[in-house]
From Swiss-Prot:
Belongs to the protein kinase superfamily. CAMK Ser/Thr protein kinase family. SNF1 subfamily. PROSITE patterns: PROTEIN_KINASE_DOM, PROTEIN_KINASE_ST. The active site is at residue 100. One of its GO terms (cellular component) is cytoplasm. Residues 252-297 are annotated as: AIS. The modification Phosphothreonine is found at residues 14, 133, 219, 276, 289, 298. The gene is PRKAA1. The keyword Thylakoid does not apply. This is 5'-AMP-activated protein kinase catalytic subunit alpha-1.
């Protein structure tokens, strides 16, 4: 029918054209997995082009949203800014500075959640090294960038984030002029208009983020500790343990590129509660009070406010046994428990109406025993009442 097919994908209409989709952006994005950063699933290279299969978000650019709707209310501005800063913090923790943060590079999904995109100007940071490249959009660029001075990297993203916050709250830019030299002077002076309707608390945050001297400029730590920013802050944005991930990833599967693409597409697009999960009525059965359903607060819960949440039930003592054996478990539904790190099988026996016997059996031990012609009945059992 005349359509072009690349790998498993059929090309549709061209939505836009960019000039920085090169190897650096590909290397950066393929490493990233964060709820507020656009995901790169796959890269297909041809002699003339590089095709990047990326996450689709339907809400368009934050810039277009502000132009159409004007300034956002303080609560909504804070929610989006918290999400953006969480993504920026993730970049910096992985030694990447974006360098071109602006509303045009922040996309919105179907639930009005922010997604940072376009890492074409990003740069990998190294300890002790400074950058000099003047890049990014002038209205959002920090004074040290437009003046050609050396900069470490993270501080320029803080400045740009401050400009985005101002745009969210005011619907305009803090520094703007059609005459570029005049615009640069305004940025280097660091003086901007603060409307009377702005909360004094957020004004203090803006002034700290838009500090001309990068040494005095707010850090992510400063912003996170600011009273205005901490209001209604979702826990998942800045977990206490940065290594924590709500998704348990099979490293072996990710080594296979086609499997990796399918794996992440399924994880990112499924409903958090699987189709195999029992209806709410199942959770009312007193026999299941010993078998917990997954009820931990997760990014997906926070990002989809319309999703009905299940009521929690009491955790079973079996979880203590699994942890004691150094296993990691994930409850898919009340009758399906996934365990990783050591290959093992679990079987649940009902002893009577109130007692169950949970049988842990090592698959490897069973295979070895069968190979030696021995009985494979040895197992670890735990009584659950």
């Amino acid at each position: 029918d005349g359509r072009v097919k690349i790998g498993h994908y059929i090309l549709g209409d061209t939505l836009g054209v960019g000039t920085f989709g090169k190897r650096r952006e590909i290397q950066n994005l393929k490493l990233f997995r964060h709820p507020h950063i656009i995901k790169l699933y796959q890269v297909i290279s041809t002699p003339s082009d590089i095709f990047m299969v990326m996450e689709y978000v339907s809400g368009g650019e934050l810039f277009d949203y502000i132009c159409k709707n004007g300034r956002l209310d303080e609560k909504e501005s804070r929610r989006l800014f918290q999400q953006i800063l969480s993504g920026v913090d993730y970049c910096h923790r992985h030694m990447v500075v974006h360098r071109d943060l602006k509303p045009e590079n922040v996309l919105l999904d179907a639930h009005m959640n922010a997604k940072i995109a376009d890492f074409g100007l990003s740069n990998m940071m190294s300890d002790g090294e400074f950058l000099r490249t003047s890049c990014g959009s002038p209205n959002y660029a920090a004074p040290e960038v437009i003046s050609g001075r050396l900069y470490a990297g993270p501080e320029v993203d803080i400045w740009s984030s401050g400009v985005i916050l101002y745009a969210l709250l005011c619907g305009t830019l803090p520094f703007d002029d059609d005459h570029v030299p005049t615009l640069f002077k305004k940025i280097c002076d660091g003086i901007f208009y603060t409307p009377q309707y702005l909360n004094p608390s957020v004004i203090s945050l803006l002034k700290h983020m838009l500090q001309v001297d990068p040494m005095k400029r707010a850090t992510i730590k400063d912003i996170r500790e600011h009273e205005w920013f901490k209001q209604d802050l979702p826990k998942y944005l800045f977990p206490e343990d940065p290594s924590y991930s709500x998704t348990m990833i099979d490293d072996e599967a990710l080594k296979q590129d086609p499997l990796a693409v399918a794996y992440h597409l399924i994880i990112d697009n499924r409903d958090f509660y699987l189709a195999t999960s029992p209806p709410d009525s199942f959770l009312d059965d007193h026999h299941l009070t010993r078998v917990p359903f997954l009820v931990a607060e997760t990014p997906r819960d926070e990002l989809n406010p319309q999703k009905x949440k299940h009521q929690g039930v009491r955790k079973a003592k079996x979880h203590l046994g699994i942890r004691q054996l150094d296993y990691e478990x994930k409850v898919v539904n009340p009758y399906y428990l996934r365990v990783r790190r050591k290959k093992m099988s679990l079987q649940l026996y009902q002893v009577d109406s109130r007692t169950y016997l949970l049988d842990f059996r090592s698959i490897d031990d069973x295979i070895d025993a069968e190979a030696q012609g021995k009985s494979s009945e040895a197992s670890l059992t735990x009584s659950v009442t």
